[in-house]
């Protein structure tokens, strides 16, 4: 009995020892001593393999280096060829990119770094990861731009590294709590910061503020995880980051859009903007396209044009333009910009920079600003009762523009004199021209002649020439009954002078405005009787008015000269008597007296009316025309 119990105790102790020993076995059944010996053998074999590289490995490395050098040489040659190629398209960046640590650039050191909201001119595609182009800044040369595919891959790698870092840091933190409530907040915060999140930071704050406190910091319970309310709050945030591309395609030349000082369609705003259009046309002659846009291009938001489900909503609304018309106008603007000329839009419906902020146009917004509301109010009232009755609407629009932060505008023209404002705008556009036209790409653009022939609508110098023609016709009609033959002979001498003065004033219009704000603005009286039809006619050169006017005036002049030449030839040919020659002398003396009288009368007429213009309010368009084109 005692022996049997002793044997049982021995078996139990032996079994415990065996279990302890088995704890040190590996997963493959080997013991710890076996694994250590095996690891030593494997380590020795690896050392022996790497310490003696074969000849094939050396030749393979040399081949790789030769291939890399050849690819780099070809990339450099393609980069040089691209310098003279036209711009294929332009993009605005939504992310920032630094090429400092980039090691897979086709030509080392030739990658282009940029910040968010920069503009890039793309010449061509190099491969799936790189484009060839340049940053639109003065002094920046051509280089390699990361493609959207490469930027997306970089973003995914960054997110993956950030998630791994969060995971390892949470494991090493020693927090062994397995409650779902602790995991959910960390997973919410694990999304790494990206450019898309930075852009929509204000939207994110609004969403987080709307979330109740129990969802913002959930308790360790399963209910807070499966709450549909918290899921709904998270979904818009992830949608925003998902659909924000790194680049937005924009026109190759950013179109210039004028806003202010108040609403377009009213005389004060129209006359100031027309003066700037006139200046730009002649200052950048041969380098600028000024076109009128009547469609409501504020409807051309990327979210609307890219989403067919929203088209029906826009079509049913009471908008003045259809989406097809808007899309056509946007395409026309893009086509104009491909010529790399300055593009200026006379957009009837754009009165605020926010109207174009979500479109793909990326315009240069120029704010024509009147700093003092009292000055603007006085200008509106000086335009007559028809404009004064809309005073409140114009003042509210001006106030909304004044409340905008300066960052919404590219240029703010708040000078007191029109000439200074014109020079300010010209300096900005000259700098932009140099930024978009580097010295290395001076070849003519083949798209220029084709596009300008079909798309551009040039602006006439001002409406003044049209108004001058009509006023001149009215003055001619009023004075026609009292005009004698000698006065008809004299007037053609005045008309060529007016035409030459018109040309000189058109070539340098900014020299005509040297007064202060109120005077410089009141000189734009050509828009007193402006209607929609007259605004349309502003884009047609008024050559017909001059041609008809000259035909009417030169006809009697030619008849009179022909009559004189007939008398002289008959006198020379037939040798009339002395009595007849004496009669002709008296007739010529009479004509000379009439010439002097009519010249004196016309001089007094222009001087008197010019003097009246200085002293009066100049409410008629003809007075402003005469003041502009005579005073040089």
From Swiss-Prot:
| Keyword Transport set for record | yes
Q: How does it sit in the membrane?
A: Peripheral membrane protein
Regions of biased composition (Low complexity) lie at 27-37, 169-181
**Compositional bias of kind Basic residues:** 570-581
One Pfam match, by short name? Answer: Guanylate_kin
Q: Which SMART domains match?
A: GuKc, SH3
- UniProt KW keywords: Calcium, Calcium channel, Calcium transport, Cell membrane, Ion channel, Ion transport, Membrane, Phosphoprotein, SH3 domain, Transport, Voltage-gated channel
Instruction: Write down any Gene Ontology CC term.
Output: presynapse
The tissues in which it is expressed are:
Predominantly expressed in heart, aorta and brain.
Q: Where in the cell is it found?
A: Cell membrane, Sarcolemma
The SH3 domain covers: 86-155
Q: Where is the composition biased (Basic and acidic residues)?
A: 532-569, 582-595
Q: Which residues carry this modification: Phosphothreonine?
A: 526
The biased composition feature labelled Polar residues covers 38-57, 462-473
Region (Disordered), start-end ranges: 20-64, 162-233, 460-610
Give a GO biological-process term: positive regulation of calcium ion transport
- Which positions does the record annotate as the modified residue Phosphoserine? 176, 179, 190, 522
Assembly and oligomerization: Component of a calcium channel complex consisting of a pore-forming alpha subunit (CACNA1S) and the ancillary subunits CACNB1 or CACNB2, CACNG1 and CACNA2D1. The channel complex contains alpha, beta, gamma and delta subunits in a 1:1:1:1 ratio, i.e. it contains either CACNB1 or CACNB2. Interacts with CACNA1C. Interacts with RRAD; interaction may be involved in beta-adrenergic regulation of heart rate and contractile force. Interaction with RRAD regulates the trafficking of CACNA1C to the cell membrane. Interacts with TMIGD2. Interacts with CAMK2D. Interacts with CBARP. Interacts with CAMK2A.
This protein is called what? Voltage-dependent L-type calcium channel subunit beta-2
Organism encoding this protein: Oryctolagus cuniculus (Rabbit)
């Amino acid at each position: 009995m005692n022996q049997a119990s002793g044997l049982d105790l021995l078996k139990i102790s032996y079994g415990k020892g065996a279990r302890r020993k088995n704890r040190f076995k590996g997963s493959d059944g080997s013991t710890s001593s076996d694994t250590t010996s095996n690891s030593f053998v494997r380590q020795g074999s690896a050392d022996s393999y790497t310490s003696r590289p074969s000849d094939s490995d050396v030749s393979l490395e040399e081949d790789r280096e030769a291939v890399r050098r050849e690819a780099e040489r070809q990339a450099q040659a393609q980069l040089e060829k691209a310098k003279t190629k036209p711009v294929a398209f332009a993009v605005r960046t939504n992310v920032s990119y630094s090429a400092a640590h980039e090691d897979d650039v086709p030509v080392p050191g030739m990658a282009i770094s940029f910040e968010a909201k920069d503009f890039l001119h793309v010449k061509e595609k190099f491969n799936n990861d790189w484009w060839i182009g340049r940053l639109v800044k003065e002094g920046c040369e051509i280089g390699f731009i990361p493609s959207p595919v490469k930027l997306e891959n970089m973003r995914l790698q960054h997110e993956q590294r950030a998630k791994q870092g969060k995971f390892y840091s949470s494991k090493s933190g020693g927090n062994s709590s397995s409650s779902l409530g602790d995991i959910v907040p960390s997973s919410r915060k694990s999304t790494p910061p990206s450019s898309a999140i930075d852009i929509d930071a204000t939207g994110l704050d609004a969403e987080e503020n709307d979330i109740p406190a129990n969802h913002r910091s959930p308790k360790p319970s399963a209910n807070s995880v499966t709450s549909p309310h918290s899921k709904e709050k998270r979904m818009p945030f992830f949608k925003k980051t998902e659909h924000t591309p790194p680049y937005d395609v924009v026109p190759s030349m950013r179109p210039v859009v004028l806003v202010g000082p108040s609403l377009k369609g009213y005389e004060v705003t129209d006359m100031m903007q027309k003066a700037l259009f006139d200046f730009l046309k002649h200052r950048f002659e041969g380098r600028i396209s000024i076109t009128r846009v009547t469609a409501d291009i504020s409807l051309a938001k990327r979210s609307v044009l890219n989403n067919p489900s929203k088209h029906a909503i826009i079509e049913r609304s009471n908008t003045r333009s259809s989406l097809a018309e808007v899309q056509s106008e946007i395409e026309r603007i893009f086509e104009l910009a491909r010529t790399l000329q300055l593009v200026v839009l006379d957009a009837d419906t754009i009165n605020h920079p926010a109207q174009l902020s979500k479109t793909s146009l990326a315009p240069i917004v120029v704010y024509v600003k009147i700093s003092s509301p009292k000055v603007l109010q006085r200008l509106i009232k000086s335009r007559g009762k028809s404009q004064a009755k809309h005073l409140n609407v114009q003042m509210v629009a001006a106030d909304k523009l004044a409340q905008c932060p300066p960052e919404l505008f590219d240029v703010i023209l708040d000078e007191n004199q029109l000439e200074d404002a014109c020079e300010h705008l010209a300096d900005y556009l000259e700098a932009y021209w140099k930024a978009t036209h580097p010295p290395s790409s001076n070849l003519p653009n083949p798209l220029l002649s084709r596009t300008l022939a079909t798309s551009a609508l040039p602006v006439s110098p001002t409406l003044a020439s049209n108004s001058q023609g009509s006023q001149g016709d009215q003055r001619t009609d009023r004075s026609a009954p009292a005009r004698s033959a000698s006065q008809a002979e004299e007037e053609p001498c005045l008309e060529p002078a007016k035409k030459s003065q018109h040309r000189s004033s058109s070539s340098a219009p900014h020299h005509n405005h040297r007064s202060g704000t109120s005077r410089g603005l009141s000189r734009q009286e050509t828009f007193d009787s402006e209607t929609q039809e007259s605004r349309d006619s502003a884009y047609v050169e008024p050559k017909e008015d001059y041609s008809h006017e000259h035909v009417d005036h030169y006809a009697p002049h030619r008849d009179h000269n022909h009559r004189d030449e007939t008398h002289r030839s008959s006198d020379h040919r037939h040798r009339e008597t002395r009595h007849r020659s004496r009669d002709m002398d008296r007739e010529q003396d009479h004509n000379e007296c009439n010439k002097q009288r009519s010249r004196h009368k016309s001089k007094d007429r222009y001087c008197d009316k010019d003097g009246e213009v200085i002293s009066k309010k100049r409410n008629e368009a003809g007075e402003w025309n005469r003041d502009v084109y005579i005073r040089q």
